[in-house]
Amino acid sequence: MKLAIPCTSCFFLLPDGQRGLNSPQPTSLRELGNTSLYDITCDRGHQQRGWLTNHKFEILFESGINALKDEYYREAVTSFAVALERFYEFSIILFLMDNFFDERQVQRGPDTLPKFGKFWNGTLKQSERQIGAFCSLYINEFGQIPLLFDESELRNKVIHAGYIPSCKQALDFGEGVNKSIKEFCKKYDEKDVGRPYKRASYVQRASIVLDMLKLKLPLPTNYGHMTKVPLFIDATSDSYFNGSISVADYVASMSIL
C-alpha cells in the first residue's frame, strides 16, 4: 500500500488560485511504514518530513479495504483484525491524555511518554491485556461495559489455522469492525472524552513515541509538516461516524474508478 504525501514546498509554489482545499497538490508516493513520520524527496528535490496525522488503525483498515478490492480475503481479515487492536490502543491513549498533556496541550515532562511506552511494551503489548486495559478505562470513563465486536473465531481461524475466508466473510468481518469503531468514535465525540478527543495531533504524538519505542528507534525531535490523506475511516470527522457508507459500498466505488 502506498501513501500519497503532499509536498508543502511545492504547494506554496502554486499560484494563489490553485491553493484551495480541493485543488490538486504535488505529492510523493511512499510505501506504508511502521511510523507516522515519513522523510520524502519530491520530484523537484524538496526534502522534508511529513507527519501523517491519520491514525494507524485508520491506515490498517484502509489496507484491509485494498486487500478486499484485490480479492485477497485472508489479508483483508488480518488487516481489519489488527486495525481493531490498534483502535483499542488509540482509545487507551485517548483516555490517558490528561496524564500526558496539560490543559495548554504541553507535555507533562520529557519522560512522561517514554515511561508509559516502556510500561506498554513490558505489560500491555499482548492483545488480551490491551482489551482488558481498554475495558477498564472505558468503564471508568462512561460507567458502562463496552460492547465489543467478537472477532476472535474468524480471526483465529485465518491467522492460526490458515483458513481462507470467502468474500462475504471478509466483507462482513470488515463491516463488523467498521461499525464497532464507528460506534465508539461517536460515543467519544458525544462526551468529548474529558476534553482531549479533539486534540488528535497530541494523541498521534503519543502513538508515534510508542511506535518508536516498539521499533527501538530514537525518539523524534522534529515531527515535520502535518498532513493527512483521505481514507475510509476518519475518527475525528463527524462525517465518518455519523455517515452510513458501508465497506461494500466503498470497495465498489474504488472498483469503478
Question: Language-model features: where?
Answer:
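Short, charged amphipathic alpha-helical segments flanked by flexible coils
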Residues: 92-142
